[in-house]
């Protein structure tokens, strides 16, 4: 499968997922984020093992030492990631808020309301904590 076809396939699936996610209430979103956090705790050894493979592959590909250092995970970093998710869980729901409202001379009331964007793409390198932070923030705001 070509890269373009692969990206198109991911894009279509992401758009479909965004439509489903945009309808979740804050309690369900927080419940899913709590389960994600528990998953990280329960599967820490598996995650660290997979990270060692990532680091080894990066070393084989002669990736810079500074980038490899950023790629490395340990138990302390897993705790930091989990703490970050806990903070995101405590954020208020950013969707459905009236940002401004006004009444037109003809009586029509117009409201500017926050809604999910839908699909968000993020480009970054070599930082596993960014993956979890971006995922949790996007999920909390109803985006994928």
What are the residue ranges of the model-derived segments?
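N-terminal Rossmann-like NAD(P)+-binding subdomain of aldehyde/semialdehyde dehydrogenases
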Residues: 1-110, 137
